[in-house]
């Protein structure tokens, strides 16, 4: 049975091939008041992300079928969504590659659930602030008589 998403809540897609990790993340995200979607491989992650357009993606780097770095790159080409990479790979070069391919944040396994939830909130807040600034900028006009100035 597919769970209905509450349109008043942010939706987070969890993409990981380890079911225990998905279960922990989904439990904690729901406890924080988020809708959740799940994908267990990279191909499914791309499909769910592009179909459902979640507000944030938690994305493992090492995935079957399509790796997380490729998922990140493909999704970011279509729409701007905060992506938080989760990986057992903690080398600096891995973090840099993930961030350069479009990830907004990177956390290594094992991770603190409390830290991860704080990062989720921070990335959602940052994205909301950016969207609000774009919307405000789009609506800023000065009209004097017949003269209209877009700011």
Per-region residue spans from a language model:
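Short, Lys/Arg-enriched segments at the junction into DNA-binding effector domains
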Residues: 8-11, 122-151
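Active-site beta3 strand of CheY-like receiver
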Residues: 52-58, 63
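The feature encodes the CheY-like receiver
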Residues: 22, 64, 91, 109
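Acidic catalytic/metal-coordinating carboxylates
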Residues: 41-44, 67-70, 75, 94
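Short hydrophobic/Thr-rich beta-strand motif most characteristic of the beta2 strand and flanking loop
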Residues: 33-40, 48
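Conserved phosphotransfer cores of two-component systems
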Residues: 50-52, 74-81, 101
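Charged docking surfaces used in two-component/phosphorelay signaling
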Residues: 23-31
